[in-house]
């Protein structure tokens, strides 16, 4: 069950339909925990198959998770059927990731 405080059930259903149409969601076993206007929270379980060379979560996959959850946060503002693309992305890793991933995206400025 997806938590929300600002979206209608119809909006949640439309978002979840769009989310589950993207193959990376199933591939990474990503679960969407919360959708609110301009916000999304996702979870990806830790699995050895996602490791990089140091037996920690591969940085490229962490970036993919962040990019994906950010997309869903944006779509809560502009509509689940809107066409979007990442044009610029920057991430700084603070330490290795040896656990499940919880990712929270919040739209600061739309447009």
Report residues per predicted region.
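Terminal targeting signals and extreme-terminal segments of soluble enzymes
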Residues: 1-111
């Amino acid at each position: 069950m997806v938590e929300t405080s600002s979206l209608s059930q119809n909006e949640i259903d439309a978002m979840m339909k769009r989310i589950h149409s993207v193959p990376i969601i199933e591939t990474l076993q990503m679960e969407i925990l919360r959708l609110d206007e301009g916000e999304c929270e996702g979870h990806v379980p830790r699995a050895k198959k996602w490791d990089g060379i140091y037996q920690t979560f591969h940085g490229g996959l962490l970036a993919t998770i962040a990019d994906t959850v950010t997309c869903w946060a944006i779509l809560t503002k502009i509509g689940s059927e809107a066409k979007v693309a990442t044009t610029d992305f920057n991430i700084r890793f603070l330490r290795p990731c040896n656990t499940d991933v919880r990712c929270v995206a919040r739209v600061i400025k739309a447009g």
